[in-house]
Amino acid sequence: MKLTISHHKCAIRKVMAEFVGVALLVIFGAGTACQVVLSTNPSSFLSINFGWAIGIATGAWVSAGISGGHINPAITIAMATYRGFPWREVPGYIFAQALGGFVGAALVYANYFHAIDIFEGGHIRTQATASLFATFALPYMTQASCFFSEFLATAVLFIVFLALNDKHNGALTNGLLPFALFILFIGLGASLGMQTGYAVNPARDFGPRLFLAMAGYGKAVFNYRRQYWIWAPIIAPILGAQAGGLLYDTSIYNGDDSPIKWR
C-alpha cells in the first residue's frame, strides 16, 4: 500500500512540475510581450526573446529535477520515441503542459486586462493583442513556409536538448540545464523567431489560444489561416522533434537506449 501511494505521489509531482513549468514559461514570455507592446515606451523584439528565454529557464529550473523538464509536448513525445520515456505517462504530461499554458495565459491576461482595453480602444479583442499570447504568422508566409519554420526550429531545439542530456557528450547537470536552454532560446528567437513567433511548443500555443477563445477573442483564433493552430504550432513541432531525434541518434549519439541500433 505504501509503495502504491508513493508511486502515485511521484506521478502527481511529475505532472505538477510540468504544469508549473509551462505556466512559468507563458507568464514570463507572454508577460514580456504584453509589456513590450502595450507600454507607452515599446521595446524591441529582442526583449520578447529574452522574456521567452527566461520563461524556459525558470520552467526548467522548477521541473528538470522532478519531471525531466520537458515542458513541451513535442519534447515529451520525442523522448518517448528515442529515450524510453514511458508512453503511459505521455498523456498526463501533455494534459498538464496544455493546462499550464492555459493558466499562465489567464494570469497574464488578468494582469494586463486594462492595458489591453486601452490598446484595443475598448472592450474589443483583435489579433493585435491575441498575438501577445499565441502565435500568428506574418502575412507573406505561405502555409508550407509556416510549417517549415516551426519544423526547423523544433528540430534544432530537440537536437540541442538531447545533447545537453547526453552523458556520452558532456551532459550538463540539472542545475546548468536551464542556463543552457536560456541561451538556446535567445538564439532560436534571434535566428528563427520572426516569421511565426517560434512556438516550437504545442502547449505554449494551444493552452493560451484556448484561453483566448474563452476570453472574448472567439473562434477567430482557431479559424485563422484554415486552422493554422493545428499544422504550424502543433504538428510541425511534433514532427520537427522527431526529425531532430532521428538526426542526432543516427549521427552523434552513442548510447544504448536509442531505438536506432544499427551503428
Curated annotation (Swiss-Prot):
What UniProt keywords are attached to this protein's entry?
A: Membrane, Repeat, Transmembrane, Transmembrane helix, Transport
Q: Which GO terms describe its molecular function?
A: glycerol channel activity; water channel activity
Gene3D superfamilies attached here? Glycerol uptake facilitator protein
**Taxonomically, which superkingdom?**
Eukaryota
Q: What is the lineage of its organism?
A: Eukaryota, Fungi, Dikarya, Basidiomycota, Agaricomycotina
Protein species of origin: Laccaria bicolor (strain S238N-H82 / ATCC MYA-4686)
Motif NPA 1 at which residues?
A: 72-74
Query: What name does the UniProt record give this protein?
Result: Aquaporin Lacbi1:247946
Q: How does it sit in the membrane?
A: Multi-pass membrane protein
User: What induces or represses expression of this protein, per its UniProt record?
Assistant: Expression is highest at 15 degrees Celsius and decreases at any other temperature.
What this protein is reported to do is described as: Water channel required to facilitate the transport of water across membranes. Shows low but significant water conductivity, but no glycerol nor ammonium transport activities.
Q: Which reaction does it catalyse?
A: H2O(in) = H2O(out)
Which residues face the membrane's Extracellular side?
Answer: 40-45, 111-143, 191-227
